[in-house]
Amino acid sequence: MWLQPIVVLAAIIIGARLGGIGLGVMGGLGLALLCFVFGLQPTAPPIDVMLMIVAVISAASCMQAAGGLDYMVKLAERMLRKHPSRVTLLSPLVTYLFTFVAGTGHIAYSVLPVIAEVARETKIRPERPLGIAVIASQQAITASPISAATVALLGMLAGFDISLFDILKISVPATLIGVLVGAFCSMKVGKELEDDPEYQRRLKEGVIENRLVETASSFDVRKARISVGIFLLATFLIVLFGSVDALRPVFQSDGKNVPLDMPSIIEIVMLSTSALILLVCRIDGIKAVQGSIFSA
């Protein structure tokens, strides 16, 4: 029935416009219409996917509270300012790496103002690096070993003797090549700023100001490095568990040896990562939930 996809699309669009928890609650309203009005039977809620997202976001939020995200942004800023003429090529690689490591695209938001500033300083149209940088951060979700998308695919292919490493050796090169091709194409988007009359007019009238974007510098470098190190170690362990089945704990179920599933491993490892960051770096847990990653 053609009304059903309209209900789904309307719930997504309205939820996205509401922002915050709007997408989630509008999804519930859309489900209510499909269930009670159209008589469709709802499936089981994706509990594992939701728990994985919560676990990964919790770990990333704790890393941000420890200054790890600011430390990563500082490193990215240093690299971009060292090679400003290559910002269109380097910025998507930076956001790709951020998302690949964290498993969520929200972590890449912090570096976008730096990318825009470096582009303006170099007289490069900001939409060139910014556009492909945002795309790259989303492409990395399908290649990240700890993203819900990758683990969901791993679960679907569980009966075909396909490991996490088998997925990554296809998804990582494919997405990286696509991002690089897109970056090269983005280098020719629009006129050069010095040849753009509208940009020159706005610059002359003071509508556009080349203000300096200051990244956070008040964080404890030692704690920041430790938090990033713990997070990277957790990501490595997840790849290891997903690639080598023999490393997973095995339990008896109906007389058969059943290894611990990857969603549970990701949830356990990432929640443990959150705890370790809080304990080792001595971070206030309330500070973690007040950060931009958790609220996003």
Go through each PLM region and give its residues.
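C-terminal transmembrane helix pair
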Residues: 7, 22-25, 83, 167-179
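Long, contiguous bundles of hydrophobic transmembrane helices that form the permeation core
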Residues: 169-292
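Transmembrane helical cores of multi-pass ion-transport proteins
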Residues: 14, 23, 87-98, 126, ...
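Membrane-interface helix termini and inter-helical loops of multi-pass transporters
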Residues: 39-45, 155-165, 244-258
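Hydrophobic alpha-helical transmembrane segments
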Residues: 1-5, 29-38, 111-127, 169-175, ...
